Amino acid sequence: MDQYEILGALGKGSFGVVSKIKRKEDGRVLVWKEICYENMQEKEKQLLVNEVNILQKLKHQNIVRYYDRIIDKPSSRLYIIMEHCSGGDLSQLIKKCRNERTYMDEEVIWRTLLQILSALQEIHNRKDGVILHRDIKPGNLFLDENKNIKLGDFGLAKILNESLYAHTFVGTPYYMSPEQIHGLKYNERSDVWSVGCLIYEMATLSPPFEATNQAQLTSKIQVGRYNPIPSQYSEHLSKVISLMINVDPKSRPNVNELLGYSFISFKVKERKLNIYYQGLKQMDEDLKIKEKKLSDIERDLQVKEQHLLLREQQINQREKLLLDKENFETQSRINIMNQQLQQQQQNQLQHQISNLSLNCNNSVNSCSSSSNNNTTNSINTQQQIHIQHNTQQQQQQQQTFQPYQIKRTFTTPLPNFK
């Protein structure tokens, strides 16, 4: 129960309250029927269990949708969670028309009839057993936000598993069939009688059979006489009502036979076409909405693209400025390095020139000194040679001629001889 939030009460019955609730996980608005079963008799408890079992089986666009059940044993309460019908019920619509003294449009009546028959076709033709509603009345026919009919309140419904007939006296007297009010066997055609009474009330704004006491009402229902519907309605509507409010259940059509009636069959096809065209119209509207959304998205993308282009231009400009700045700084560093290198080279060159000049001076001095020494040495050598030569001549003069010695003397190289 913590997963639901109570929004407010919608109605109150003999065994509990019907409240509008909101499912917290998704915010969906639903209804729960709170039923206290503590003081119920076994028969009533069985009807309650029966309703839940039937609701679990039914999934149809014209039947109130069942979602879940919660059993609170400490408080002896059962919560049946169902679809919320925001349009109220058919009894409220009839009361409104009665107060305003206006008749319903015939197309509204036909649409209601076709939707009720669609719901009954679902429950009367089930393979796992025919389901009788047994309490069809304006208060049990709900309207959604689009004014579509939803058959609800299956508290008196019965599944015919073993027999084609039921015997129990249940239902609302104004809408009960003759066989049902007399305690005779009845089947799904009894629901058709109730639908006939309901459609009649939509046209005339009052039930076909009214009385001040049960006996009088029973007598009128047994006879089956009622006042004609207002003349503003078609003969087809009057004919269909007379088919449904037929005291002889064997002559009264079932749902499938009613849907096969020519005018109703035509209305069914017309309704299907209307639903189809409404679907196309809705698809067209949805497409227009999607196109508008896509157009808005495209426009937003264009704006974003322009912003991105502008941003890209700004970034490119910044990158260019940064690159120019970086190139300028790099070139400046290169220029400084070149200047430093040139200065270093100049310094080295000057140093080399200075060293070279110093070396040259030293060389000159050395050469000058060496030249003087060489000159002196040369003079001394020449003097020595001259002296030696003279000595040799003297020796030759003193000695006898010896060819070998002469040859030896002349083949010996002379130092620094020029």
Curated annotation (Swiss-Prot):
Signal peptide interval: none
Its biological purpose: Involved in centrosome biogenesis. Seems to be required for recruitment of centrosomal material and might be involved in de novo centrosome formation.
Gene: nek2
GO BP term, pick one: chromosome segregation
Record SUPFAM superfamilies: Protein kinase-like (PK-like)
One function term, GO molecular function aspect: protein serine/threonine kinase activity
Family designation: Belongs to the protein kinase superfamily. NEK Ser/Thr protein kinase family. NIMA subfamily.
Protein kinase domain sequence ranges: 4-264
Binding site for ATP: L10, G11, K12, G13, S14, F15, G16, V17, V18, K33
GO cellular component, one term: centrosome
This protein's name: Probable serine/threonine-protein kinase nek2
Organism of this sequence: Dictyostelium discoideum
Gene3D superfamilies recorded: Phosphorylase Kinase, domain 1 (3.30.200.20), Transferase(Phosphotransferase) domain 1 (1.10.510.10)
